[in-house]
């Protein structure tokens, strides 16, 4: 009986630990608290549609640019986020996407398209196949792709 009790206790402990890990890994709700300090909503300029079309073409993915809620932190080169300093930040939670761009980069095709690619792939991380090989949307691969 002691062995059975010990096994049940170990199982309960493992399940509780798994639940805590899952909660820690699950993104929180997208909303004002998930945005960098100073973020304000903005309407994407018409140029973003051209960049979206290019990003769809290079990635072979499709999506709806209009479904993204856009934010910027005006007057900054880097935004302070809970995951470090960023020039762009893609978040998806509860079926809603937000993209926040540092104010100095709202007109930067590389930065904006990089965040668009996250949306088209619906994922964090930077799979080399898409971000480097297909689309050239990293600082190092951008110059090669754009011919600069």
Please tell me what each predicted stretch does.
Residues 22-24:
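C-terminal motif of bacterial Sec signal peptides marking the signal peptidase cleavage site
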Residues 19, 51-52, 129:
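Processing junctions and N-termini across compartments
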Residues 113, 117-121:
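Short active-site segment of divalent metal-dependent hydrolases/proteases
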Residues 28-106, 148:
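Auxiliary, metal-adjacent structural segments of Zn-dependent hydrolase domains
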Residues 105-110, 122-148:
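Post-HEXXH active-site segment of zinc metalloproteases
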Residues 2-15:
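Bacterial N-terminal signal peptides that target proteins for export
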